Amino acid sequence: MNEHHSLFAACPRGLEPALVEELARLGVAQPRAQRAGVAWEGDLESALRACLWSRLASRILLGLSTVPVEDADGLYQAARDLPWEDHLLPGDTLAVDFHGSNAAIRHTRFGAQRVKDGVVDRMRAVGHPRPSVDTAAPDLRINAVLAGGRLRLGIDLSGESLHRRGYRQGGGRAPLKENLAAGLLWLAGWPRIAEDGGGLLDPMCGSGTLVLEGALMALDRAPGLGRERWGFSRWAGHVPVYWKRLRDEAEERAAAGGRRRLALVGYDQDPQAIRAALDNRERAGLRDRVHFERRSLEAAEPVGERPGLVVVNPPYGERLGQRQALVTLYASLGARLRGAFGGWQGAVFSGAPELLDYLGLSIARRHALYNGALETQLAVFALREQGADRRSQGATALDNRLQKNHRHLRRWLRREGVKAYRLYDGDLPEYALAVDVYETESGRHAHVQEYQAPRSVDPRSARRRLREALEVIAAHLEVGPERVHLKVRRRQKGADQYRPVDQTGERWVVQEGPARFYINLSDYLDTGLFLDHRITRLRLGEQARGRRFLNLFAYTGTATVHAALGGARETITVDLSATYLGWARDNLLLNGIEPGARHRLERADCLAWLAGQAESRPGRYDLIFMDPPTFSNSKRMCESFDVQRDHPRLIRQAMQLLAPDGLLVFSCNRRGFSLDEAVASDYACREITRETIPPDYARNPHVHYCWELRHR
């Protein structure tokens, strides 16, 4: 009982100071923080107590020896020299966990093999049978660490990692290990808050790990109480009477703690996550103590009779598009915490620390942590008591502008039945955004494009303004954060603007006049529907009856749909992108138009296609729409393209394909574009830019340029 051992509790990096504090509370004398763990000298009972009670540790290791080692033979000899017969019972199995390397030992599997060989040969040398290896569930798990020219050998008393409490089967969304979750709660001050009778709420609880760990803490239930198998269970040095005494004490404390009444609540809007949380709650034996409910972030509200802790582990977002979407989520989270949780303690655990600025909260403490290899931060803050959410002068001005724009557009929107429109377009210099509203068949969405700030602008100020803007937009449009889709507009090169920024595959349907279109608000910079050409498409639909229609640089084929619905005799849709041609096909089918001989889709480089068709099929089309990009140097194109430089050739080739009484509608978006004088002289040209700029783009009359061209 009084024999002292070298002991080590491993933990996630960043939790070492908290683990020192926890072990000290468990009676450990002079615990010392080391990298990814805490060391101490103590008796066997202190090690067993740590196995049973530590919420933050991942493993408890009992050290046997530390010796200099240079090569594989040294590994073998160090292992063979230890009296393994004092630790491994005859006929029992073993496994070796090896960590580290040097110039001679480069692979952990090889290192583990040499240590195992030393152990096996030692057992045979003292007359015991050769032990077998069982990597899944060994009777004795040996821990070997090679670092700094020294080999540390020990026994893993925990066996399976201590984070496995037994209640979590499926991870759900971005699973958080139980010991790291407990560490977050410890750092956020939950033990003190629970002692004072405060509640715990996770408004984005996922599979419920944070709430369940908080419940185990508050109810004084040892995290290892439900575990049957331990690393010391078959260890020859195990003293069962010590373990029984510790378990009996833990059961008494759990019974006493179970009489406490606290509000322990988790919300999530994902029904699958809530189902997982409920299953985990059942396995944890906390059915009557923890409440999980499907609820949106905007509906989250305080629980219990006293201020408590609201703790959140939002999604991390690995791709650019996901990170941009999280800006909206963080802004909405901060707004909800400020508006509804005054007097509470708050904590947000983020795998993208730069997003914490979008909370708009004054952070009292930041803790740098590692979730596996990922650098993370826990931000802790005290939420001030306040009435209505106070906005900055700039945010108030933005809200006023949105209201003004809506009032100006309301009558037109109602009269024309417009379901997708631009509400705001950089009207205020400090809020350089474009805001488009989509009234889809399944509800309202906001598509927000931030124009990238110049380097001279302070990044934190820019993040603050964006956060304010997103809050104002969501509140004005009365939509939740999942319906505000943020993009960042940077200077695009070549086909960059058409490359995906995310891969959700989510689509919605929006109405435009007689047509219905699929839009994607997340995966690309653009949505599949250029709103500034709404009038142009409607005019094409009116002009198409009985005509042969050609749509060049067709994008998602929206103009083709209008032409087909308008009674076009036939249509052909040409674009280089297979993605957008597939989208065009879906748009046709959505409107009851069957692609085929009458409505052809052709994947081709429009420049090469025009050059080939102009000579072979003159006068083939009665109505042509051509809306080329400003610039392109796509590797799939036979040549680079600049609309100012190349539009004369492009127009002349298109005019060769136009019937004598036909109409070519040419448009482009290049700022400062001017139509070639020779083209204007050779054809009957009429600029219709003003006629095709809709009221929602009146503030930006140069969003596109548009002409009608006919043969003279």
Swiss-Prot record:
<keyword id="KW-0808">Transferase</keyword>
<protein>
    <recommendedName>
        <fullName>Ribosomal RNA large subunit methyltransferase K/L</fullName>
        <ecNumber>2.1.1.173</ecNumber>
        <ecNumber>2.1.1.264</ecNumber>
    </recommendedName>
</protein>
<dbReference type="InterPro" id="IPR054170">
    <property type="entry name" value="RlmL_1st"/>
</dbReference>
<dbReference type="InterPro" id="IPR017244">
    <property type="entry name" value="23SrRNA_methyltr_KL"/>
</dbReference>
<dbReference type="GO" id="GO:0003723">
    <property type="term" value="F:RNA binding"/>
</dbReference>
<dbReference type="InterPro" id="IPR053943">
    <property type="entry name" value="RlmKL-like_Mtase_CS"/>
</dbReference>
<dbReference type="GO" id="GO:0070043">
    <property type="term" value="F:rRNA (guanine-N7-)-methyltransferase activity"/>
</dbReference>
<dbReference type="InterPro" id="IPR019614">
    <property type="entry name" value="SAM-dep_methyl-trfase"/>
</dbReference>
<dbReference type="Pfam" id="PF10672">
    <property type="entry name" value="Methyltrans_SAM"/>
</dbReference>
<keyword id="KW-0698">rRNA processing</keyword>
<dbReference type="GO" id="GO:0005737">
    <property type="term" value="C:cytoplasm"/>
</dbReference>
<dbReference type="Pfam" id="PF22020">
    <property type="entry name" value="RlmL_1st"/>
</dbReference>
<keyword id="KW-0949">S-adenosyl-L-methionine</keyword>
<keyword id="KW-0694">RNA-binding</keyword>
<keyword id="KW-0963">Cytoplasm</keyword>
<dbReference type="Pfam" id="PF02926">
    <property type="entry name" value="THUMP"/>
</dbReference>
<dbReference type="InterPro" id="IPR004114">
    <property type="entry name" value="THUMP_dom"/>
</dbReference>
<dbReference type="Pfam" id="PF01170">
    <property type="entry name" value="UPF0020"/>
</dbReference>
<comment type="similarity">
    <text>Belongs to the methyltransferase superfamily. RlmKL family.</text>
</comment>
<dbReference type="GO" id="GO:0052915">
    <property type="term" value="F:23S rRNA (guanine(2445)-N(2))-methyltransferase activity"/>
</dbReference>
<dbReference type="InterPro" id="IPR002052">
    <property type="entry name" value="DNA_methylase_N6_adenine_CS"/>
</dbReference>
<comment type="function">
    <text>Specifically methylates the guanine in position 2445 (m2G2445) and the guanine in position 2069 (m7G2069) of 23S rRNA.</text>
</comment>
<feature type="domain" description="THUMP">
    <location>
        <begin position="46"/>
        <end position="157"/>
    </location>
</feature>
<dbReference type="InterPro" id="IPR000241">
    <property type="entry name" value="RlmKL-like_Mtase"/>
</dbReference>
<dbReference type="InterPro" id="IPR029063">
    <property type="entry name" value="SAM-dependent_MTases_sf"/>
</dbReference>
<keyword id="KW-0489">Methyltransferase</keyword>
